[in-house]
């Protein structure tokens, strides 16, 4: 059974707020989020499913992804979003948000907070990825560390 990209997008959209997305059409949102998919796939290097088995025209993976796999992929997409929109862009230094609810008093402090948030997301997702890898090893009957014996002197 196939997994549509839309499942990833739905999971991802609930994790962040963007001022641009409400102004976009559904197709524009899909195109925008699709840009974060390929880097997310390359980061998910221990996936037990073949993430390259996909149809970009039909916007789906040709395999069924579990909820954990969808969560890991959408988290990596979120990290890619933060990287591209905030971390790797010089426009961060020219922040002009019209919202009266959110004011930036120090761009340097704001950047520090963004970097801390980014690091937190990466750490949390790497932990989830490690658990996913361990679950796969356990399900496969692989005994990690088996066969290695310390010699006593």
Describe the function of each predicted region:
Residues 31-108:
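Divalent metal-cofactor coordination and adjacent catalytic microenvironments
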Residues 1-65, 127-134, 139-153:
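Conserved short "hinge" loops at termini or chain/domain junctions
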Residues 105-138:
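Polybasic, proline/glycine-rich intrinsically disordered low-complexity segments
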């Amino acid at each position: 059974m196939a997994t549509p990209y839309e499942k990833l997008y739905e999971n991802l959209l609930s994790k962040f707020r963007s001022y641009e997305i409400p102004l976009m059409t559904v197709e524009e949102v899909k195109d925008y989020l699709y840009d974060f998919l390929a880097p997310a796939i390359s980061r998910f290097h221990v996936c037990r499913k073949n993430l390259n088995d996909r149809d970009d025209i039909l916007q789906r993976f040709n395999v069924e992804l579990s909820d954990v796999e969808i969560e890991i992929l959408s988290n990596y997409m979120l990290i890619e979003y933060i990287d591209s929109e905030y971390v790797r862009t010089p426009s961060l230094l020219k922040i002009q948000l019209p919202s009266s609810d959110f004011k930036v008093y120090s761009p340097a402090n704001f950047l520090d907070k963004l970097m801390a948030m980014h690091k937190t997301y990466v750490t949390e997702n790497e932990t989830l990825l490690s658990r996913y890898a361990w679950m796969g090893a356990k399900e496969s009957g692989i005994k990690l560390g088996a066969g290695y014996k310390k010699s006593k002197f």
